[in-house]
């Protein structure tokens, strides 16, 4: 792996300051993968999101409605973490598939095995009234193939808009991946929010989380156009191809690979019920507890390709653009 010096990771899409056209050869690369990587990706993003709500005084006393939650193994860690902090949360986990048995028998967790529609969303809202709702959505439908089609995505995003409209949550974390430009159908609308990148996503995943906190006014919508899709594809490929394959040499941590650097900045914001001498000690404690929970082995930094020559990834001249590639970024989860 090549090396780089960075002050902070690209936490949000708007912070990505370069772009790169897709190279078809990337599809043949063997992806490095951790066990339970999908659960790790979800756990880190949701722990960061819920800790942010805790910081703003929004989390305590809320009901987390998680639609598309199965198998939900990682949710047990989230539940236990906030329970041990004394934060009062109820969980309603809804999916047409069955959940991990590790979630059975918890008084503050309700498991629902069904898919949602508008009628059922209205019944949830009535059932939970007047509780404040925090919505997490990981809905995903695939009618064929390895990835959802553009039709699938548009259907999912329309459903997520209905969720927001009916449930009227105080905050939400929604699944978000822009359709690829070469599969474009039509412009559409999504809720206004921050598009958060995800450490430990698959190598060329273009998926993010759309985070929003609502302050009482009507939901604001953002129009997504084909021009946005082109921009999104190039920036996400740059993030995945260039940035995520770096070792961060000025990052003092047992594993200096970029995804661990990204994880560090997420976990440093998380509250704990014990004190630590340094932020690094706290993050190590949290990482080890998460990896232990998910049975993920601890690894050290992969061997670098060259001697450490420090360079800034953010330099606009560091990547050649317009490589005349017509293929889209591929990788959804």
Curated annotation (Swiss-Prot):
GO terms for molecular function: mRNA (nucleoside-2'-O-)-methyltransferase activity. S-adenosyl-L-methionine binds at residues 39, 66, 68, 72, 95, 97, 116, 138. The active site is at residue 175. GO terms for biological process: 7-methylguanosine mRNA capping; methylation; regulation of mRNA 3'-end processing. MRNA binds at residues 22, 177-180, 182, 205-207, 233. Residues 169-249 are annotated as: Binding to NPH-I. Belongs to the class I-like SAM-binding methyltransferase superfamily. Poxvirus/kinetoplastid 2'-O-MTase family. This is Cap-specific mRNA (nucleoside-2'-O-)-methyltransferase. It comes from Variola virus (isolate Human/India/Ind3/1967). The lineage of its organism: Viruses, Varidnaviria, Bamfordvirae, Nucleocytoviricota, Pokkesviricetes.
């Amino acid at each position: 792996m090549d090396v780089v010096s960075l002050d902070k990771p690209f936490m949000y899409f708007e912070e990505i300051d370069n772009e790169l056209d897709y190279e078809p050869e990337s599809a043949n690369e063997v992806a490095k993968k951790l066990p339970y990587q999908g659960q790790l990706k979800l756990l880190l993003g949701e722990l960061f999101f819920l800790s942010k709500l805790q910081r703003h005084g929004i989390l305590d006393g809320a009901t987390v409605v998680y639609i598309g939650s199965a198998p939900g193994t990682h949710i047990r860690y989230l539940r236990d973490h906030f329970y041990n902090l004394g934060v009062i949360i109820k969980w309603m986990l809804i999916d047409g598939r069955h959940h991990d048995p590790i979630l059975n028998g918890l008084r503050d967790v309700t498991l629902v095995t069904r898919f949602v529609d508008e009628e059922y969303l209205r019944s949830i809202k009535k059932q939970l009234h007047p509780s404040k709702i925090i919505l997490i959505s990981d809905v995903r439908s695939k009618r064929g193939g390895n990835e959802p089609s553009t039709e699938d995505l548009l259907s999912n995003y329309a459903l997520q808009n209905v969720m927001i409209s009916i449930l009227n949550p105080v905050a939400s974390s929604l699944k978000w991946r822009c359709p690829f430009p070469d599969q474009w159908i039509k412009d559409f609308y999504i809720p206004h929010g921050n598009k958060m990148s995800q450490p430990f996503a698959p190598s060329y995943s273009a998926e993010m989380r759309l985070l929003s906190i609502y302050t009482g006014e009507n939901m604001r919508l953002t129009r997504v156009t084909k021009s946005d899709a082109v921009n999104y594809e190039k920036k996400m490929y740059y993030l995945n191809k260039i940035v995520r394959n770096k070792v961060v040499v000025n990052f003092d941590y047992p594993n200096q690979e970029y995804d661990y650097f990204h994880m560090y900045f997420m976990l440093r914001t998380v509250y704990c019920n014990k004190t630590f001498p340094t932020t690094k000690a706290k993050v190590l404690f949290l990482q080890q507890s998460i990896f232990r929970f998910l049975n993920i082995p601890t690894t050290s930094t992969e061997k670098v390709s060259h001697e450490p020559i420090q360079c800034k990834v953010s330099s606009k001249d560091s990547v050649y653009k317009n490589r005349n590639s017509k293929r889209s970024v591929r990788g959804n989860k």
